[in-house]
Amino acid sequence: DEQQIQPSSVDMRLGDEFKVFKVIRKTYIDPKDEEDIAEYMESSTVPEGEAFIIHPNEFALATTQEYVKVPDDLVARVEGRSSMGRLGVTMHVTAGYVDPGFEGRITLEISNIGAMPVALYPGQRVCQLVFETMTTPAELPYGHPKRNSKYMKQLKPESS
């Protein structure tokens, strides 16, 4: 869609699949225990035309609707759109960097730091990709057999 092309970025749309933490009775989540993390996350798909409501202080994983392929000589950054930020909704917590060679849908780490619940719709433009040219192509890009590229070709939100 030509409307997604901005002067220095490409707008990305929200996908329809989300993962949220279940309310649990546990004192902590162990990031080394993949089964532990999976057990405490709940997946949902939002039907077309309906909204995903993110409440204040809530966190959710989602993906972009777009499947991207980053060439070996580019790096990309995910930035939230100002329209989301002005509602108190962030699109990434720490993982705003997309490696050269990455292929897949980009996982968004959505947080509502505002005071009101916010409706998010699949297909809505929520973030943008900003590309930067590297001086030389990556020697071992994301997806290279020598790398542990666990999110390569992901289609759904992936937890840690």
Q: What are these regions, as identified by a protein language model?
A:
Residues 1-160:
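DUTPase catalytic domain/fold
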